[in-house]
């Protein structure tokens, strides 16, 4: 046991919390000590919610967004514009775009971007399922709303090459989103304007 910790159980709990993104050991310690001060019922409810999430959450069979059912609420909503599909990197980006209240179409979650340095290729992403969605018909515009990074631009170009002859309009967000920024960290007003003022994608990286 590390002499810094009075209990091996405490040390183990801190170690597990510190594995979470953005959580260092000091923050992990505060979280663990906070839980220790709570009633047993509160801690059990917290643990149960995490376990239930892991075992029962589903991914939408259409867009790959997180859902409680086979088809997510957005895809199942007849009031959404099914002729538009906004392609995003991850589920957090869906939430970011929804928060702008400037988009009423559907989504397609890739699950990442092409990144050879990280060992992520096109086959690791939900690109082929996007191609199949477009091929099924009914989609007039695909909005490429990926992060303005080299990896995001590379992914945009790859998708462009896959869809360019399929008769759909391909557009990208207006450059209100700064180069190098990830979508989820862009403020709602800027992101909303970038969606409204989106431009046709010309196939350049």
UniProtKB/Swiss-Prot annotation:
GO biological process: DNA recombination; DNA repair
Entry keywords, A to Z: DNA damage, DNA recombination, DNA repair, Metal-binding, Zinc, Zinc-finger
Natural source organism: Bacteroides fragilis (strain ATCC 25285 / DSM 2151 / CCUG 4856 / JCM 11019 / LMG 10263 / NCTC 9343 / Onslow / VPI 2553 / EN-2)
C4-type zinc finger segments: 60-75
InterPro entries membership: DNA_Rcmb_RecR (IPR000093), Rcmb_RecR (IPR023627), Rcmb_RecR_Znf (IPR015967), TOPRIM_dom (IPR006171), TOPRIM_RecR (IPR034137)
Protein's name according to its UniProt entry: Recombination protein RecR
PROSITE patterns on file: RECR, TOPRIM
Chain's role: May play a role in DNA repair. It seems to be involved in an RecBC-independent recombinational process of DNA repair. It may act with RecF and RecO.
């Amino acid at each position: 046991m590390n002499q810094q910790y009075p209990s091996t159980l405490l040390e183990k709990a801190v170690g597990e919390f510190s594995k979470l993104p953005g959580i260092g050991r000091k923050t992990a310690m505060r979280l663990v000590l906070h839980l220790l001060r709570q009633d047993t019922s509160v801690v059990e409810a917290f643990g149960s919610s995490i376990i239930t999430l892991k075992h029962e959450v589903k991914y939408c069979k259409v867009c790959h967004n997180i859902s409680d059912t086979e088809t997510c609420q957005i895809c199942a909503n007849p009031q959404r514009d099914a002729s538009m599909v906004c392609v995003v990197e991850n589920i957090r980006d869906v939430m970011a775009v929804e928060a702008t209240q400037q988009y009423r179409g559907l989504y397609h979650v890739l699950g990442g971007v092409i990144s050879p340095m990280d060992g992520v290729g096109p086959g690791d992403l939900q690109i082929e399922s996007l191609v199949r969605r477009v091929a099924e018909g009914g989609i007039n515009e695909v909005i490429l709303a990926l992060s303005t990074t080299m990896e995001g631009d590379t992914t945009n170009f790859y998708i462009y090459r896959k869809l360019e002859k399929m008769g759909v309009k391909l557009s990208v967000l207006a450059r209100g989103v700064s180069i190098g920024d990830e979508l989820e960290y862009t403020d709602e007003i800027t992101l909303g304007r970038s969606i409204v003022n989106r431009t046709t994608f010309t196939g350049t990286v």
